[in-house]
């Protein structure tokens, strides 16, 4: 199968997802260094989630019989002066990803590619939750008297965790991808809310 504009955009999005994963690791490490373990854990988990979004896309491209070249990524931001800065960056990143997923969905529809359209529809729904969760976290941080209030909020509300899987709301996906792609690729159990199998977790 020859690459189409949709497939070329999707291949580029693989790089964007890996870049988002790396940025979340950098944010998590910064919070870790500030002795804010729940914020750190939240973003380590977000990093894993973005990585596995990328792997889902890689698996999809390969399953469609298309060769893929994994793109490189730009350096990420590691230094922040306030705790609000990484949260603002994270929200902006999720909004940018949402815009790119919308572009992918539109490209699949333009090409009359129902498989691509269905695949991207899952990511669109995911991004609604991701943007909402990150917006909530940023708003809580801005209203909190101190960062330990944010830590307690994360412990109480499990923002971005959602019970550890997409079967309930939205959590992390793990590295394996089976189920929807026939026969399975990697290990794990199938979460009812995802088009893929979830392979490892934190």
Question: Where are the language model's segments positioned?
Answer:
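Iron-associated oxidoreductase/ferritin-like identity signal
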Residues: 1-202
């Amino acid at each position: 199968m020859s690459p189409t504009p949709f497939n070329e955009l999707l291949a580029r999005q693989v790089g964007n997802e890996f870049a988002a994963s790396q940025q979340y690791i950098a944010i998590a490490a910064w919070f870790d260094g500030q002795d804010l373990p729940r914020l750190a854990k939240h973003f380590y988990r977000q990093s894993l989630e973005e990585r596995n979004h990328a792997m889902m896309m890689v698996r999809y491209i390969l399953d469609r019989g298309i060769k893929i070249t994994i793109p490189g990524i730009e350096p990420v931001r590691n230094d922040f002066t306030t705790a609000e800065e990484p949260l603002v960056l994270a929200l902006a990143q999720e909004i940018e990803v949402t815009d790119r997923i919308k572009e992918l969905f539109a490209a699949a529809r333009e090409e009359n590619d129902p498989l691509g359209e269905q695949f991207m529809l899952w990511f669109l729904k995911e991004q609604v939750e991701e943007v909402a969760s990150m917006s909530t976290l940023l708003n809580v941080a801005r209203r909190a008297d101190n960062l330990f209030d944010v830590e307690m909020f994360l412990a109480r509300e499990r923002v971005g965790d959602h019970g550890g899987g997409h079967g309930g709301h939205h959590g992390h996906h793990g590295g394996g991808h089976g189920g929807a792609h026939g026969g399975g690729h990697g290990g794990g159990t199938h979460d009812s809310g995802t088009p893929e199998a979830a392979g490892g977790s934190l």
